[in-house]
Amino acid sequence: MDVIERFCKIYTDICQISPAELESIYANDILFIDPITTHRGINEVKDYFANLLTQAQSCQFDIANIFTCSYNSSQSQSDVSHVVNWTMTLVLKNNAKVITLDGTTQLGVNNDRIIYHKDYYDLGEMVYEHVPILGFIIKKIKGKLAK
């Protein structure tokens, strides 16, 4: 099983991830970026997931498709070798509301380890729209813009 297959398997249910599994897919010098923050190195990524696990009741990814990009073997850390499209279903422990979010991840792979991981998703859809008053306002604005 190559690193992309292991990545997809692990991300099926993030709440079941162990630090050893993270080490099996991410390089020691991983650069992990999402719309909220940036993590450098496997220890920061493990801390990020440990924090996520304290807050999430469940977090599952449905991988829609994976695209392989052409790249050369002397790639830099930010060179993208794969693009993964997914739908995340998240339930937080303090709020049983289900959050469903579509997103894309760019991955860079070298020596069967992921050295670059960058997530793209609508942060408003993930966070702001679930704050009662703010969510109402954002949904109203989106509705007016869609007309």
Task: Report each predicted region and the residues it spans.
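A short, structure-level motif marking secondary-structure boundaries and short turns
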Residues: 3-4, 34, 89
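Short acidic-aromatic low-complexity motifs
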Residues: 4-25
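A solvent-exposed, acidic/Ser-Thr-rich amphipathic alpha-helical stretch
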Residues: 20, 24-74, 80-82
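A beta-strand edge to alpha-helix "cap/lid" segment located at domain peripheries
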Residues: 55-60, 68-147
